[in-house]
Amino acid sequence: MTRNTGTRNTWARNTWTLSADHVDLRRPVRKPRPVEIGALPQRLTLDLARTALVAVDLQNDFCHPDGWLASIGVDVSGAAAPIAALASALPGLRAAGVPVVWLNWGNRPDRADLPPGVRHVYDPDGASTGIGDPLPGGSRVLELGSWSAGLVDELVPEPGDLHVAKHRMSGFPGTVLDAVLRNLRVDTLLFAGVNTDQCVYATLVDAANLGYDVVLVEDLCGTTSPGFCTDATLYNVRQCFGFTTTSADLRAGLDTQEP
């Protein structure tokens, strides 16, 4: 009798095949699934078999009118802007076999792993409502397992989706994100989420520096920052790190894939 080491794993892509007296170290071979999409600065051909979507920080504290940002007077409409487009794009990506990774802030209740520089961003004067502090509704800002750190209701994870908690602007330092992506055997990352110019960008840059191909999906990202911040981010992504596309271009490519 043989058994694959990934039989309990929805995304069993980095596995061995085992029997009582033999171990086959060959990984499963997936047929390439190329699709061509419009992008900048050049058109792209993606291999869907080696692509994942990373959706960043689409959480109540950033996007919901009862969340942390709104409670301190920030207009969250910019952060909420990509939610409907992402909800519309997800079924096609999942049907194409693209893994969805939800990458969200999720801090320890004791904040023991947060250096002063990170805490200062969210509480610059030491007297404001910052990470881990209670909100009027009782939830604590970006605390793992809280309503505040939860995904917005409009985005419904499916059982095969993956979840990674982060505690920096980038999703890589001190997290399992790189290990998860390596085990998925993916090379190309599509980026969605908020804020375009902050956590999405920081994670994208780290991903590029780790050797991943990075593609920012413009209308699946949003921000509460001034417009010039998005302009600068898109320029830098195209100039220094990777590519940008839109959900319409992505959908057009998915529609042409072979069954």
Where are these regions (language model features)?
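N-terminal nucleotide-binding beta1-loop-alpha1 segment
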Residues: 56-57
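Active-site-adjacent betaalpha module
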Residues: 1-52, 61, 92-96, 113, ...
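A short alpha/beta connector and helix-capping loop motif
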Residues: 49, 67-93, 98-104
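Short, well-ordered beta-to-alpha junction loops that form the rim of enzyme active sites
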Residues: 103-106, 194
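Short catalytic/ligand-binding loop motif for oxyanion handling, primarily in non-cytosolic enzymes
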Residues: 108-112
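Short, glycine/acidic-enriched capping/hinge loops at junctions between secondary-structure elements
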Residues: 64-69, 113
